[in-house]
Design a protein with these regions (language model features):
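Short, solvent-exposed loop/linker segments at the N-terminal edge
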Residues: 80-86
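Proline-enriched interdomain boundary motifs that mark the N-terminal boundary
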Residues: 7, 68-75, 118-119
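Hydrophobic beta-strand segments
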Residues: 1, 105-109
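Terminal connector regions
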Residues: 26, 30-70, 141-171
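Short acidic/proline- and small/hydrophobic-mixed sequence motifs that coincide with surface turns
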Residues: 57, 99-105, 166
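Hydrophobic core residues within well-ordered beta-strands of beta-rich domains
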Residues: 23, 43, 88-90, 134, ...
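Intrinsically disordered, low-complexity Pro/Gly/Ser/Thr-rich segments with frequent PxxP/GP/PP motifs
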Residues: 6-37, 116-146
Length: 171
């Protein structure tokens, strides 16, 4: 068993199987993969068949695939410099390095200082294919009363149903 699998239907009854006969059971078992499964997680199963005479067991595994986000680049447009009283654009570039498409990707930004104000703190991307690069942008302003050469920690989170990336960046 795996912490990433929830088995809903785990048994199937058959009337009889003749010697040398092969039986295919379509939609015989039902299980769900949890949302937090890591990309390329190997999930092991044990199949047990039994009758009045004895028991047969075999094992098999499947690989679960999930999106996986990685930060590629952070850019402040137009020139990577923002002075007090100015407005600029923050561009974050991410890669989906996982093996599955990510749906309804949500990027959230947070800064604790009142000197920095983002136009959008939540940015939605509908779909990001496996291996695809995507970016989010938002304008932000730095208060005119902010001290010159101040550094502000920006916390960002990128999440979809099956993956979350949390980190921070000094602005």
């Amino acid at each position: 068993t795996s912490e990433y699998i929830e088995i809903e239907d785990n048994s199937e009854m058959l009337a009889a199987i003749d010697v040398e006969e092969t039986i295919n059971l379509e939609k015989a078992y039902r299980f769900y993969v949890t949302a937090d499964v890591p990309n390329q997680e190997k999930i092991n199963f044990i199949l047990t068949c039994s009758d009045k005479i004895g028991t047969y067991q075999t094992a098999f595994s499947i690989d679960a695939f999930a999106p996986e986000f990685a930060l590629n680049e952070i850019t402040i447009l137009p020139n990577n410099i923002v002075k007090p009283g100015e407005t600029a654009t923050l561009k974050l570039t991410f890669d989906n390095v996982g093996n599955s498409v990510a749906y309804n990707v949500l990027t959230e930004l947070f800064v604790a200082s009142s000197d920095v104000e983002f136009e959008n703190t939540t940015i939605r991307t509908d779909e990001v294919a496996a291996g695809e690069t995507f970016f989010v942008t938002t304008d932000f302003s730095v208060s005119s009363s902010a001290a010159l050469s101040s550094v502000y920690e920006v916390i960002y989170s990128v999440c979809s149903k099956y993956n979350v990336l949390h980190s921070n960046y000094d602005l």
